[in-house]
């Protein structure tokens, strides 16, 4: 859900 399409937790 961040930047491009990668989700960081």
Curated annotation (Swiss-Prot):
Broadest EC class assigned to this enzyme: hydrolase
The organism's taxonomic lineage, starting at the top: Bacteria, Bacillati, Actinomycetota, Actinomycetes, Kitasatosporales
Gene Ontology process terms (BP): DNA catabolic process
Protein name: 34 kDa extracellular nuclease
Function recorded in the entry: Involved in DNA degradation in the substrate mycelium. Cuts DNA nonspecifically. Possesses endonucleolytic activity.
pH dependence statement: Optimum pH is 8-8.5.
Species for this entry: Streptomyces antibioticus
Domain of life: Bacteria
Nucleotide-binding recorded as keyword: no
EC number: 3.-.-.-
Cellular localization per UniProt: Secreted
């Amino acid at each position: 859900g961040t930047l491009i399409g990668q989700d960081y937790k």
